[in-house]
Amino acid sequence: MFGCYKIKSVETLVTLGKSKLEEGDFDVALDLFQQAILLDQKDPDLWNLTGIALRSMGRYSEAVECFNKSLSLDPRDKDSS
């Protein structure tokens, strides 16, 4: 949910999440990325973005888990934080 709307597009969730991440609104960004993961659990970029949001919130062990998940899905992903 974003506001009173239920978003069902991974692309829209990611776009909004990245915007919130840039604004420093990490809680909302995390929520949006987690919603995107519910729609596509096999996208390593979603796990990486979730890790970035968690790291920004100081939730380091959870962030590492997300980065590891991203790498397990795509071991060649040089962008995985």
Located regions from the model:
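Conserved structural position within tetratricopeptide repeats
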Residues: Q35-L38, N68-S72
